[in-house]
């Protein structure tokens, strides 16, 4: 790989934004896009009433509800870096999509509501990042409202998440009393709601302002200085190495809604966020600077443009250089493909991409060739990157087309939406009736909404009373083993499994069939 290409790869910053719903993830995403010059104004998302929708929330149901249920991909340039943001679903029912997205990034930005601290979904997603060793940058949001005390939030970060924290800035007051941010890294105080030429006030060597200023009269100014002194003396030492290893999280305070502290965060993040990292494969570690092109499909999205009924496969480029029109091998099938139709995204806006490098996320128009987890490369034809996570569903519904004359629409819709991985498909063993499985109820609602809106197919769903899926070997697939509390079905790859009513039904099955091994997904 040439030095120019190495430099280009090193400039990539590919990260996901993770949070509990309503922590402000979408708002901060919009502010980042604002600084990247991609949009001219940021609108806040609160669903139907406002009529304003976030740039990253492009699907109709997201606009209606004000939540993210799919992962959007956005790209822009900032201070010499190419930024690739993946805005993940905030709703826990779509955690599988989020987990797959986290396989495609090099770092994560964790957004926390200052009033609520660490919430359930935040904790789940943090654990995945930690498990993968992904560096985590923390943005404590909504400082323009009353919330928990900053020292309390730091203690919660360290105790609940078990990670070292290092505050890069520190709030001077909060809520109505918010006066500014003490920036430990840039050695300035950033004033809240100030004129541009007075926004940043330089600090002296003693840690106080170089020149007297009205902000020093704030009730919370002296308190902030005392807390900074405490952090300097008793807090963690700053360590770039520990940040990159995912063992220390830099903490930024601010308000995405009022756009306070966001650009400072972005500027600092670009300095410290890692460049594209290596990826594990069946042929060893593939480094980003490997000259051979390779990448994996982490997401498939149908109907991003409903007028065209298209399907886009999102690929994380792991190594080398992509050029439009290049030939690659889809290693799962051994099939040779020409990558003639490729695109980059800003939510639902797209443009043709002619080249991209390791770290970039691109979309490939898919006519049915790809599956989530596929590897494509112009190198070794046997290369496969590590498997992407797949969750065992916990809710199951039989699904039918209400109008038997529209079976074609029904089957096409089910098949395409299942291929996206947001819902799983099973079929009854002999009659092959459709059963869909999900992690949470919202997935069924989104499925029904999209079937009606995108495929003109009204559906009927009926609970089947089964909640646990366990796979078996093909030689153990005997329909005679089904009972009132268990039923034999097959997944979309024709692998056999039993759906059980509860743990008691599983234990009963195991007692009766001790030689049959039951396995689950994640």
From Swiss-Prot:
It is found in: Cytoplasm. The keyword GTP-binding applies. Its main location: cytoplasm. Keywords: Cytoplasm, GTP-binding, Nucleotide-binding, Protein biosynthesis. It comes from the Bacteria. One of its GO terms (molecular function) is GTP binding. The keyword Cytoplasm applies. Belongs to the TRAFAC class translation factor GTPase superfamily. Classic translation factor GTPase family. PrfC subfamily. Increases the formation of ribosomal termination complexes and stimulates activities of RF-1 and RF-2. It binds guanine nucleotides and has strong preference for UGA stop codons. It may interact directly with the ribosome. The stimulation of RF-1 and RF-2 is significantly reduced by GTP and GDP, but not by GMP. This is Peptide chain release factor 3. It comes from Listeria monocytogenes serovar 1/2a (strain ATCC BAA-679 / EGD-e).
């Amino acid at each position: 790989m040439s030095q120019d290409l190495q430099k280009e790869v090193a400039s990539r910053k590919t990260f996901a934004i993770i949070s509990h719903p309503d922590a402000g993830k979408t708002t901060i995403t919009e502010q980042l896009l604002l600084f990247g010059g991609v949009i001219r104004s940021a609108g806040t998302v609160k669903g139907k009433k406002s009529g304003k929708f976030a740039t990253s929330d492009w699907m109709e149901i997201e606009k209606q509800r004000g939540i993210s249920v799919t992962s959007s991909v956005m790209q822009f340039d900032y201070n010499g870096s190419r930024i690739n943001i993946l805005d993940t679903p905030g709703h826990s029912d779509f955690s599988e999509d989020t987990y797959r997205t986290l396989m495609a990034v090099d770092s994560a930005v964790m957004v926390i509501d200052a009033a609520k601290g660490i919430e359930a979904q935040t904790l789940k997603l943090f654990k995945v990042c930690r498990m993968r060793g992904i560096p985590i940058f923390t943005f404590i949001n909504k400082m323009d409202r009353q919330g928990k005390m900053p020292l309390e939030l730091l203690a919660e970060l360290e105790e609940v998440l078990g990670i070292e924290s290092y505050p890069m800035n520190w709030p001077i007051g909060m809520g109505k009393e918010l006066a500014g941010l003490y920036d430990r890294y840039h050695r300035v105080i950033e004033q809240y709601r100030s004129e541009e030429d007075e926004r940043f006030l330089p600090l002296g060597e003693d840690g106080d302002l170089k020149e007297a200023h009205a902000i020093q009269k704030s009730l919370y100014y002296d308190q902030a200085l005392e807390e900074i002194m405490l952090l300097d003396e008793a807090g963690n030492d700053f360590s770039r190495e520990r940040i990159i290893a995912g063992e220390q999280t830099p903490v930024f305070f601010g308000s995405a809604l009022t756009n306070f502290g966001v650009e400072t965060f972005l500027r600092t993040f670009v300095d410290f966020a890692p460049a594209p990292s290596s990826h594990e494969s069946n042929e060893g570690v593939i480094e980003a600077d490997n000259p051979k092109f390779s990448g994996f499909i982490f997401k498939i999205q149908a109907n991003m443009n409903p007028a065209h009924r298209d399907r886009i496969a999102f690929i994380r480029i792991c190594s080398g250089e992509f050029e439009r029109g290049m030939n690659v091998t889809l290693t799962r099938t051994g099939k040779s493909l020409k990558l003639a139709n490729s695109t980059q995204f800003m939510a639902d806006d797209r443009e043709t991409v002619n080249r991209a490098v390791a770290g970039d996320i691109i979309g490939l128009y898919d006519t049915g060739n790809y599956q989530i987890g596929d590897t494509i490369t112009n190198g070794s034809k046997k290369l496969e990157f590590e498997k992407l996570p797949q969750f065992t569903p916990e809710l199951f519904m039989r699904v039918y087309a209400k109008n038997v004359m529209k079976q074609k629409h029904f089957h096409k819709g089910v098949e395409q939406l299942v291929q996206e991985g947001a819902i799983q498909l099973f079929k009854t063993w002999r009659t092959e009736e459709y059963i869909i499985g999900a992690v949470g109820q919202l997935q069924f609602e989104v499925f029904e909404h999209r079937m009606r809106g995108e495929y003109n197919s009204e559906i009927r769903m009926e609970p089947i009373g089964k909640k646990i899926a366990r796979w078996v070997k093909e030689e153990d697939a005997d329909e005679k083993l089904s009972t009132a509390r268990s039923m034999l079905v097959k997944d979309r790859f024709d692998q056999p499994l039993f759906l059980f009513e509860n743990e008691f039904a599983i234990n009963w099955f195991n007692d009766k069939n001790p030689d049959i091994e039951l396995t689950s997904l994640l």
